[in-house]
Each structure stands twice: as C-alpha cells, then as structure tokens.
Amino acid sequence: MGARPVLVGFALLAAAPVLIVSMPAIGAQAGRAPANSTLTAVPGIKVGHHTLTERPTGCTVVLAEAGVTAGVDVRGSAPATRETDLLSPVNLVQIAHAIVLSGGSAFGLDSASGVMRYLEERRIGFEFGPAHVPIVPAAAIFDLSVGDGRIRPGADCGYQAARAATDSSVTEGSVGAGAGATLGKAGGMGRSMKGGVGSASITLPSGLIVAALVVVNAAGDVIDPANGQVVAGVRAADGKSFADARKMLRAGGPGGVIAPAGRQNTTLGVVATNARLTKTEATRVSQMAHDGYARALAPAHTPGDGDVIFTLATGERTGNTDAGQVGALAADVMAGAIVRAARQATGVPGFPALRDLK
C-alpha cells in the first residue's frame, strides 16, 4: 500500500478530507505526525507575534523574505485592509514579502509600516536607488471593545513581530493579532468568548504542502465540521452552555436578531503552499479557502464582517500543480485552523475561553 497523506487534524474517507481535529494525525512515512503542523511547515515562511502588555491586542506577521507569489480575496463587507488592491491579478506587482494581521481596527494597519522598516533595513524589497520597497499587505480585526480601545498596535508592534518571526511551529491562542479577538458576539458582548490564532497544515506524499493560519474574531459560533457541533460561540444564559447562533438566526423576534456587537467582527486568514502558482491562481486559492470559513463559522461573511484570506505560494515544489487541488485543501486546513483557534484561546476578564467553561 502506498504512502498515506499526512493530514494534521484530518482523516481521509474515500477521496474527501473530513475534519477530525480531535484525532491524532497519521504520518506518511514513519507513522508519525510531522514535527511542524502549522503555517511554517511551508519552507520559506516565518511567523512572528507581538502582544501589547497594556491591553489584549497585538499583531501577527507572516514573513516571506524571498518574495513569493501572492493573492487575496476580501469577502467581508466591512474590511480594514492595506495594499490588497496591489494583489489583484490585473495589477503589476506579482509578489509580497510579508503579510500583516493586526488588532486595533483600521488604526492597527500602521503595524505594516514597522514591518516595512524591518525589511528595508535588511535590504529586502524592490530596489529603487538607495531605497528598498517591500510589499506588505495587511488586514485588521476590530478589537477595540476589549480593554482600552485607545491602545492600538502601531509601527513598533509590527517591527517587533517581524523581529520575532521564526520558522518554528506557530504559537497559537490569544497572542498577536488574536490577543483581543472574540467570538460569539451575536448575543452581545456579555455572552461572547475569547477567540485567537489557530493554524493547521496538510502534507501529501507528492510533497505538496498546504497550510493555513487564521485569526478568529467572529460574530457567531465556531463549528466542528466533523460533527456539526458548536465548539465555542454565543453562550446561553447559564454562561457555560451554548445558545447556538444558527438557532438564534432562525428564531425571529427577541433573540433572533444579531446584537450590535455582532457587527464588530472579522476573521483573517493566510494560506501558504510550496506549490508554484500564478497570481491569478493564488487569488483563486484564496477564494476557495473561504469555504473553510463557511464550514467552521456560523455565520460567516456577514455585512458586519471584514473577512479576508491571503495566499502565499513559494514555488519551492517544481512541476505542475492543480490550483483547484490546492484551493480545496486550503479550505480544509482553514477550517481546521479555525477550530484550533477556539480550542487554544485563553480567557481574559469578561471574556472566557473554551477551556474556562469546562
């Protein structure tokens, strides 16, 4: 029997990946899971976080210092983004050197300036005389309701996150851009929970790697696609069980309308792969990866969301790659990363995490 795919948090039934985040991964060769099952499983990708001490907020930086093909799909109706137009397939620049995910809403986009400074100091970017101009798209979540909203990530936060970036397994939970992330706000902030950063990856016997990192700051619930059960989300009146946002949306009348706080949300994702993709194909992968949001978040892509997914393709794996295959796998690992974000989160005063409800 041939080598089996390595699915971190997944199992294969027939040809379709099924999310089973509670089960251990099965190694392709040695019968073990890979040492790194996060975004940095893709060679050439580094991730760093910086979390502010003054309040729960911060930023997360994905470095691709060599410059890699990049695409994006901004699916939410209320995005806070920077340089995403540059990643359109019809525009000139084909690569990015980093992606910044930040708290602080639109103010947090300043974090990208610090990452640009970090990269220019290392002569990374497009050279124009004495200057080097790195391409650093960014997106931010709304977390101003957690702690003192006057405290926001800025350029120094981005610089420190870039300095901290490594190719080691990504630290998950309530760190970096996920420090102030919350979920379950459809029932009001008083019934919400802590969100955060999650990551997952898949490696096929062919050597293809597809990985995802996500910052979950959702209005509703995180759903485990393996069983359709709520993992974390809107808490019921007892503060321990779940109200189920899907039932709330169908109830009508009192309790059937998303609370105003349910409009203060955004989920941000980055897909990375060692496949060789064009800019158009990377954009398509971003589009397909949003299926992972739809599987693991209820609801997703609402008028109050700024949902964004970036894709980085390093091209390290030579030969032809089906962008459709990469996109389908990206949706799977994105869903897995979302579930991990909920499970790895840690609570702060007023916002319990899943582990606090047990």
Regions found by a protein language model. Give the residues of each.
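N-terminal secretory signal peptides that target proteins for export/translocation
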Residues: 1-3
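Small-residue packing motifs within transmembrane alpha-helices
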Residues: 5-12, 333
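Bacterial N-terminal signal peptides
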Residues: 9-21
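Signal peptide processing junction and immediate N-terminal pro/mature segment
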Residues: 21-30
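A structural signal for small-residue-enriched, beta-sheet-centric alpha/beta enzyme cores
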Residues: 31-106, 110, 121-358
